[in-house]
Swiss-Prot record:
The protein's required cofactors: Ca(2+)
The keyword Calcium is assigned to this record: yes
Matches recorded under SUPFAM superfamilies: Pectin lyase-like (SSF51126)
Pathway(s) served: Glycan metabolism; pectin degradation; 2-dehydro-3-deoxy-D-gluconate from pectin: step 2/5
Active site as annotated: R239
Gene name of the encoded protein: pel3
Sequence positions that bind Ca(2+): D150, D152, E187, D191
Function per UniProt: Involved in maceration and soft-rotting of plant tissue.
One Gene Ontology term, aspect cellular component: extracellular region
Protein name from the UniProt record: Pectate lyase 3
Disulfide bonds: C93-C176, C350-C373
GO molecular function: metal ion binding; pectate lyase activity
Length: 374
C-alpha cells in the first residue's frame, strides 16, 4: 500500500529564498555544501543548466581550471520533467536499456548545494565522484532510465561529507523479464561507495525501489560512517542499506512494505537501530547474501520490542541459501560506539503518526521534533 504524504500548502515557494543557517544534519555529515559566505547562486531550469553551471565554476576569471573548483555554488533547480516521468511509468520495462541521464559532480571540493523548488521534478540522477561538501535537498527523482548503465538516482563515490535531505526518490518495485543476470528494472536510490564517509541521509521519501542503497560496493570496500534518519521507505525490496563494514546509525525511520530484506549488516559492520517503526516487513534486520563476516546491531526503543510483537506488526522472516543471521530473537548482537553528534530522536510511535508530514519534497524542509508529537 502506498504511503501517502501530505503536501505543504505553499506548493510553489522557492526554498532557496529562506535564510541560511549553519549545517545541523542530525548525523555524521557536517557540511553546508555550497551555502557559505562567498557562494555564487544560480538558477537552473534543466539538467544541462546544472551541468553548465558546475563546469563554469571549475574555471577562474581567465578560463583556467582551478583544482577543486573556483568557488562554492548554490544551485536552485526549478525544472519540471513530469512528462518524462509519466512516459517512463507507462513503459516500465523499457527504461532499463535506455541511456542513463545524470549530472556528474566530479573533483569539486569547494562545496555545492542543489535545491529543488517546490513542484520541480527530475528524470535524471546526480552522481558524485571525488568531490566533497555536497548537499542535495527537495529534489524529486522519478523512474531513472539506464538501469543497465548503473543509472542510480544518487551515487556517492569517493566523496565525503554529503547531506541528502528532504528528497523523493521513486520507481517501480517490479522485475521485468530479460534484464541482465535477473537484475532489477531500475538501479539504486542512493548508493554510497569507496572513500565516501560522513554522510547523512535524512527526511527522504523513498518508494517503489527494488535496490534502495549500498554502503560499499564489495567486501573490500568497508569502513564508512553513515546516518539515516527520518526517512520513509515504502514498498521497497532490499538494501536499507546493504552495509559492508563501518558504522550506520539509523533512527526515526519508517519502514513499511519491505518485500525481501531491510537493514542488511555485513562485513563486520555495526548498526545502531534506534526508535524506528517497522511494519509489514520481511527480514527487517539481518545479515545475509554473504555467508561470512556477519555484522552486528544494537536495537534501541523501536516499536518492535520482542518476538511477541512480530504478528502485531506483520514482521516475517525467511532463510537464505548461504549462512545468515536474522534478528529473529530481536536482541542486540553488538554495542555501538558513542554517537559523535547531537541528535534528538522522537518516539517510534511519533514516527508512525507524524513523519509523513515532514519527509519528502514540498515540506519547506520542516523537521519533526518532540513538540510536534502531541
Amino acid at each position: 500500500m502506498k504511503y501517502l504524504l501530505p503536501s505543504a500548502a505553499a506548493g510553489l515557494l522557492l526554498l532557496a529564498a529562506q535564510p541560511t543557517m549553519a549545517a545541523n544534519t542530525g548525523g555524521y555529515a557536517t557540511t553546508d555544501g555550497g551555502d557559505v559566505a562567498g557562494a555564487v547562486k544560480k538558477t537552473a531550469r534543466s539538467m544541462q543548466d546544472i551541468i553548465d553551471i558546475i563546469e563554469a565554476a571549475k574555471l577562474d576569471s581567465n578560463g583556467k581550471k582551478v583544482k577543486g573548483g573556483a568557488y562554492p555554488l548554490v544551485i536552485t533547480y526549478n525544472g519540471n520533467e513530469d512528462a518524462l516521468i509519466k512516459a517512463a511509468e507507462a513503459n516500465i520495462c523499457g527504461q532499463w536499456s535506455k541511456d542513463a541521464r545524470g549530472v556528474e559532480i566530479k573533483e569539486f571540493t569547494k562545496g555545492i548545494t542543489i535545491i529543488g523548488t517546490n513542484g520541480s521534478s527530475a528524470n535524471f540522477g546526480i552522481w558524485l565522484t571525488k568531490s566533497s561538501d555536497i548537499v542535495i535537498r527537495n529534489m524529486r527523482f522519478g523512474y531513472m532510465p539506464g538501469g543497465a548503465q548503473d543509472g542510480d538516482a544518487i551515487r556517492i563515490d569517493n566523496t565525503p561529507n554529503v547531506w541528502i535531505d528532504h528528497n523523493e526518490i521513486f520507481a517501480k518495485n517490479f522485475e521485468c523479464a530479460g534484464t541482465k543476470d535477473g537484475d532489477t528494472t531500475f538501479e539504486s536510490a542512493i548508493d554510497i561507495k569507496k572513500a565516501s564517509t560522513n554522510v547523512t541521509i535524512s527526511y527522504n521519501y523513498i518508494h517503489g525501489i527494488k535496490k534502495v542503497g549500498l554502503s560499499g560496493f564489495s567486501s573490500s570496500d568497508t569502513g564508512r560512517d553513515l546516518t539515516y534518519h527520518h526517512n520513509i521507505y515504502d514498498d521497497v525490496n532490499a538494501r536499507l542499506p546493504l552495509q559492508r563494514g563501518g558504522q550506520v546509525h539509523a533512527y526515526n525511520n519508517l519502514y513499511t512494505g519491505i518485500t525481501s530484506s531491510g537493514l542488511n549488516v555485513r562485513q563486520k559492520g555495526i548498526a545502531l537501530i534506534e526508535r524506528n517503526w517497522f511494519e509489514n516487513a520481511k527480514n527487517p534486520v539481518t545479515s545475509r547474501y554473504d555467508g561470512s563476516n556477519f555484522g552486528t546491531w544494537e536495537l534501541r526503543n523501536n516499536n518492535v520490542m520482542s518476538p511477541a510483537d512480530f504478528a502485531k506488526y506483520n514482521i516475517t522472516w525467511d532463510k537464505d541459501s548461504k549462512p545468515y543471521v536474522n534478528a529473529e530473537d530481536w536482541k542486540s548482537t553488538g554495542t555501538f560506539a558513542s554517537v559523535p553528534y547531537s541528535y534528538s530522536p522522537v518516539s517510534a510511535q511519533c514516527v508512525k503518526d507524524k513523519l509523513a508530514n515532514y519527509a519528502g519534497v514540498n515540506k519547506n524542509l520542516a523537521v519533526l521534533t518532540a513538540a510536534n508529537c502531541n
